[in-house]
Amino acid sequence: MSFVFPSWSTAFSPAFHEDAKAMLEGALNKGDKPPVIQGKIEVVELHMGEQPPTLTLLEIGDLSIDRFRGILRLGYQGDAWLEVRCRVQANPLSHNPHLTFSTLPLSTPLLASQPLLVPMTLRLSKLHLRAILILVVSASKGITLVFKNDPLQNVDVSSTFDSVEVIRGYLQQEIEGQLREMFREHLPGIIHRLSQKWFSGSGVGGKVEMPYRDMSPVPSYAPINEEVEEEENEENHGTSPGNEESFPPRHIGPGGITLPLNNSVSQLAALSYSAHTLSPYARGHEHIAVRSFPYLGKSGAGTGSSGRASLASSSVGEGDIKAKRKRIFRIGKSKEADEKSEA
């Protein structure tokens, strides 16, 4: 089973970007940084890109109303990018403070023993991920994510010092090491803290909230009642089309997945039961055309003594069924008496 993420480019609001940038900044500044980086690492820009990741469900370990546990395969090779800003120490003498000046050849340009801090901008793009992960979703505890292998396959690192080949290779190696540690140690905690903002309440009655997605209010449709529907149709028979209430069309993503309505379960139940009827009238559903047919059960022995006709002999698609000749039955008179009276 695979999953498709519809509308990936518009699924994240500015509030999500601000929270994600703050958590990424805290994760990058946590722990020991390379000695060449001085000061605080600032996350300047975060863009989720246009191409969504792919998830393939491999195994379901636990499935209930408020809990899911499974093993999935994650794949991503999109156009997301991250830009950070920091200060690096450009003075080579500061890396080895025990080095004496007598061991260095003196030349015209002298090197300073004080550290020289140079601002640098890093841009991470062309991220390629492939991993097997264990996903646990709980309505009360949030989302727990564990990678079973190293997800990072490749990343493109560009910086202010791309013209210097030695510095470029050094930064590529250091950033890849920091990203591998972040995916292993810090990213599961970031996703868990973000998921706790999405879920509110506890247990089965908990309500799931998505504060980061900008969604317009969607009208809810109540279950269809035939009597109320007929009365409304009779009252609105003479109204003009301009007075009817119109709703905007539903947004359909690139994967063909529509956002569910608030009363979608009732609509699916009504649609399922609409075929189990002998009524010639079809229930009205948005974007769905339904035709009611009589129930075709097992064929019986024809017309029984009780006068019930078998519907199994009728077939759909053979053309219109011609109406039979109307028969008149009179109680208390025989057929011969009727012919004599008519003569």
Curated annotation (Swiss-Prot):
Belongs to the MDM34 family. Component of the ERMES/MDM complex, which serves as a molecular tether to connect the endoplasmic reticulum (ER) and mitochondria. Components of this complex are involved in the control of mitochondrial shape and protein biogenesis, and function in nonvesicular lipid trafficking between the ER and mitochondria. MDM34 is required for the interaction of the ER-resident membrane protein MMM1 and the outer mitochondrial membrane-resident beta-barrel protein MDM10. Residues 1-196 form the SMP-LTD domain. Coiled coil: none annotated. Keywords: Lipid transport, Lipid-binding, Membrane, Mitochondrion, Mitochondrion outer membrane, Transmembrane, Transmembrane beta strand, Transport. It is found in: Mitochondrion outer membrane. This is Mitochondrial distribution and morphology protein 34. Its main location: mitochondrion. GO terms for cellular component: ERMES complex. It is a multi-pass membrane protein. It comes from Cryptococcus neoformans var. neoformans serotype D (strain JEC21 / ATCC MYA-565).
